[in-house]
Amino acid sequence: MTVSNASYLKTFYDKTVAHGAKVISSDFTLEIEGFEDYWLLCKQAPWPELSSQGEIEIPTPLGSMMYQPQQIRTAQQGQISFYETVVGDIDNLMLELITQSGAYSGARSTFNCKIYEGTPEKYLRYKRLIDCFVQLDTVDRDWENRTQPLMVQGTMFFHYFGETVEGNSSDYN
């Protein structure tokens, strides 16, 4: 085990503190446009980031190679989870999303949403996701599970083009 002296460790502490406070994963909300009252029921959602889709291998002389980046990945996906209510709010929400008109001619069930760092009332920033849809997993119910609310989970597919809007709060207060 390495034992470093305190002054050496203090340099790492000081450099880490200089970067500022870290974002806490739980400090988010997801608000679906047209269904703004449901934001308190979303427990988990994907946080979009722009990056390359991957690498392109470029052969070079003498059996060598190099990489260059692929196009930016704007079509993304990630896990989403909702708390169901006794009146079936999420069940009804999914039915509404399926039957509403989408962005494409004749397409159905796409929606736009905002994912906030904070809440819709007080936030550091939000990112706008467009042409989203959700593929839900089959919900498992269990007679022995008396300790957890019913979770409806699945995958949200969406497009993100880097649209980030600065917020109205510096600390959610």
Spans of features found by a protein language model:
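Residues within well-ordered beta-strands of beta-sheet-rich folds
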Residues: Q79-S81, K114, T155-F157
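Short C-terminal domain-edge/linker segments immediately following a structured domain
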Residues: I58-L62, S109-I115, E144-Q148, E163-S169
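Acidic, glycine-rich loop-and-strand cores that form catalytic or ligand-binding grooves
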Residues: G88-Y126
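Glycine-rich loops and low-complexity Gly/Arg-rich segments
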Residues: P69, Y104-R108, V139-D142, V152-G162
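Solvent-exposed edge beta-strands and adjacent loop segments
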Residues: M1-G88, D131-M151
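Extended serine/threonine-enriched, polar tracts that run as long, contiguous segments within proteins
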Residues: N112-Y123, R128-D137, D142-R146, F158-F161
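Protruding loop/beta-arch "assembly-hinge" segments enriched in small, turn-prone residues
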Residues: S7, M151-Q153, F157-N173
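Broad hydrophobic/π-residue packing in well-ordered secondary structure
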Residues: K22, S26, A75, L93-I98, ...
